[in-house]
Amino acid sequence: MATLLIDNYDSFTYNVYQYLCSQGADVVVYRNDKITVDEIVKLNPVNIVISPGPGHPSHDAGVSRDVISYFAGKLPILGICMGEQCIFEVFGGTVSYAGDILHGKTSTIKHDNRGLFKNVPQDNQVTRYHSLAGMPSTLPEVLEVTATTDDGVIMGVRHKKYTVEGVQFHPESILCEHGHTMISNFLSLRGGNWDENPAAGVLAQKVPAAATEKAAQEASPAISTPPTCSTILSRIYAQRVKDVQAAKEVPGQSQADLQKLLNLHIAPPLRDVVNRLKESSPALMAEVKRASPSKGNIDITVNAAEQALQYALAGASVISVLTEPKWFRGSLNDLRQVREACPLLPNRPCILRKTFLLDTYQILEARLYGADTVLLIVAMMSDEDLRELYQYSVSLGMEPLVEVNNAEEMARANAVGAKLIGVNNRGLHSFDVDMETTSRLAEMVPEGTILCALSGISTRADVETYVSQGVHGLLVGEALMRAWNLKEFVAELLGYKKKDPVPHTPVSRQVQVKICGISSVEAAVEAATAGADLVGLIFAEKSKRQVTVAKAREIVDALHKLPTRSSQLPVKSQKSIDWFDVQTEMVEQRVPWRPLVVGVFVNQSIEYMSQVAVEAGLDLIQLHGTESAEIARFLPVPVIKAFHMDASSFHAGQIPYVTQPGNNQLLLLDAKVPSLPMDRQGGLGQKFDWTIAQDIVNVKRPGCSKEQTFPVILAGGLDPSNISEAIQQVRPWAVDVSSGVETDGKKDLKKIRAFVEKAKSINLQ
C-alpha cells in the first residue's frame, strides 16, 4: 500500500515526495485534476498528503477538498500549506489574508507537542511561503489549533477525532527544523481516528489526582483559540502601540515637544476638508498606496509627492497618504512631501493622514507633517477613546474622517457627531471586501453628514451605484495606482463627459519687454509709448543709474497720467495650475492698461525696500543681489528674483534651485561677471549664455503640456541688434535691457523704441 501525494501544481511537491521517501514511504503522485475520488478508492492508499499550491483553496485545489471530505476518518491525511487551508475550509472555516506575504521566510512557532509535533522542540524554526491563512475567529468546532507564530498566525490544525493534520508552513524545506521528524510522525499513524493511535498523544490522558502544580506546568503547552490567535487588525494595533511609544521616546519628539512646534507655527496652513469635498460631486479621494496587507506590494518604488501631484492635477479633492510602515510601506516623510508638493496649486486638495490612530500624539504628528484631516477607525477603539481622539482632532482644526464597517460602528460614529463618515467595504479583521457594506449603511447617515465609500472601488458602475445611494466621497487607492493613464481613468470613473479631440492650434504670443535703468521721466514715457510692459528703476546704492525716491515718484506719476492702452483685459482659454504661470498671467492682465514699474534693489533691507515700494508706488520689486528668494514673502508687492548665471560653472543641478516655486513670482536670468562682486552685477552689457536659458525655459513641469515653456525674463547683453535672435532661440516670457539701449551711458530714446519694436514684432507659438 502506498502514500498518495496530491500535487496542487506546486514546485515544492517533489520536495515533499523526497521527504516522504526518505522516511520509507512508497509514494505515488497525482495532480489535483488528473484523478478522482473513485480512482483513489481503487488505489487503496495507506495515507494521503495534500501538497502546497498557488491560489486559494476554494477554487484552485482541484480534487483536494473532496479527498479530505471522503477519506477523513478512514485513513491519515496531512495537508501542507494550501493542503492545510483545504482542511480548514472543508470543516467550515474561512481562509483569508494572513497579514503578510511571505516567500521563503522563517518564523518561530509554538506547538502542542502532540501528533505531528511529538518530539519536536518548542520555538522551532519553520519556513513559510504563503499570504493566506485560516482565520482564527472562524476556527471550526471539530478542529483545534496545534501551532502558531509568535504573533498569533495559525501554523497548524488538527481534527479532534480523525487523524487529519495540517501545517501552514513547509516541513520539507531545508530551512525548516525537524521537518523529517514531523513527516515520520505522520507516517507512523494508522487508521482514521486518534483513538487508534494512542502513541501520538493526541487524546486527553488521564493524570493521577495527586499530580502537582509543577507537573501541570511542565505539561505540553496548550495552543489556545481566539482571542489569543490574532486578527490582522489586532496585530497591526499591537505594532502601532510599539511604534507610537518608540516615537515618543525620541529626543525632541515627545508630545510636549510637538506641541511646542505647533505653537511655533511649524505646521502649514489648514484647509477645511468638509468644504473642499463639497466643491465636487462626487469627490475623489485618491490614495498614495505602495502596498497593503491584502495585496502585498502594489508599487513599492512610487514617489509619494509625484503621485500626489498627478492625483491633484487629475482632479482629486483629497489625497490620502498611508503612513503605516510595516504593512503599507508608508511614512510620515511621505506625508510631508505630499503636503509640500501641493500647496502651490491654486486649489490644492486636502491631505489625509491614513494610518491606524490610537493616540492623540499621532494626530499632533499629522498636523505638523501637513495633514488637513486624519482617519479614525471605530473598530480600533472604545467609545471613550473615539470621543477623545475626535474632539482632539477637531480642536486642532481638523475634521476627521471616521471609518465604520457595520451598523454598530455607524451608530457610534453618529454619536460623536462625525461630519465626515467613511464606510470601509473591507473588513479589517479578515481584509475581505464586501462592496454591499456601504449600501447597507447609507441610510444610517444623518442629514448634513458627508458619506464616503472606502475600498474596492474600481469601475464607473461602482461609482454610479454609490452616488445613487447618497455617497459623496470616493476613496480609491489600488485602482489609481495601477491606472495606465491616470487622467483618463479618473475622468471615466467620475463620469466626466468626453470631449471631441481638438487639434492643437498654436497660440501666438509676444514677449513682455522691460526697459531697466530708467532715470528720467522722458525715457520712461518713451518706453511706455513705444509699448514697453515694464519699466525698471534702480535703487541700488552702487549703481550709476540709481534714482531717488522722489524721482521715482515723479516717474510713476507721469506714467499714471498716460492714456490707458487697452480697455479690455486678456482672457485665458485654459486655467493655469503652475505657480509661475499663474503669476505671469497676473502681470499680463495688468500691463495692457499701462507699464508696471519695477524697483531694482541689491542686498538692501526688507524695511527699506518696503518703504520705497509704498512711497514711490512700485508695482514690483526686483531682488538683484544675493538675497534669498524667501524675502519675497515679506515684501508688499510681487517680486522678480534675478539669478546671475556663470556659464563656466553652470550645471543642470542648479535648475531646481532657480525654478523653485512659492516665493518669488517671477525670475530673471542674467550673466555673471566673475571678476566683480555680487553687488555690482547687472547693467554691464555682459551677454548671457542663451543655451543655459534654453535649458531652463524647456524644463518639464507637472501638469504642463510639452508646448508650455517655463516663463523667464531674459537679460544680459541684449540690444536692438540681437534681440530678435535671442527671442527666437530662447523663447522667453520677457526680455530685459538696460545698457543695450544707451549711448554714452544715457538712455537713447531711439534705441529704446527700436528695441521694443523689434521685440514686439516677433510672434512666438
UniProtKB/Swiss-Prot annotation:
Pathway: Amino-acid biosynthesis; L-tryptophan biosynthesis; L-tryptophan from chorismate: step 1/5; Amino-acid biosynthesis; L-tryptophan biosynthesis; L-tryptophan from chorismate: step 3/5; Amino-acid biosynthesis; L-tryptophan biosynthesis; L-tryptophan from chorismate: step 4/5. L-glutamine binds at residues 53-55, 85, 131-132. Pfam families: GATase, IGPS, PRAI. One of its GO terms (cellular component) is cytosol. InterPro entries: Aldolase_TIM (IPR013785), Anth_synth/Amidotransfase (IPR050472), Anthranilate_synth_II (IPR016302), Class_I_gatase-like (IPR029062), GATASE (IPR017926), Indole-3-glycerol_P_synth_dom (IPR013798), Indole-3-GlycerolPSynthase_CS (IPR001468), PRAI_dom (IPR001240). The active site is at residues 81, 170, 172. Gene3D superfamilies: 3.40.50.880, Aldolase class I (3.20.20.70). Keywords: Amino-acid biosynthesis, Aromatic amino acid biosynthesis, Decarboxylase, Glutamine amidotransferase, Isomerase, Lyase, Multifunctional enzyme, Tryptophan biosynthesis. Residues 512-765 are annotated as: N-(5'-phosphoribosyl)anthranilate isomerase. It catalyses: N-(5-phospho-beta-D-ribosyl)anthranilate = 1-(2-carboxyphenylamino)-1-deoxy-D-ribulose 5-phosphate; 1-(2-carboxyphenylamino)-1-deoxy-D-ribulose 5-phosphate + H(+) = (1S,2R)-1-C-(indol-3-yl)glycerol 3-phosphate + CO2 + H2O; chorismate + L-glutamine = anthranilate + pyruvate + L-glutamate + H(+). This is Multifunctional tryptophan biosynthesis protein. It comes from Phycomyces blakesleeanus.
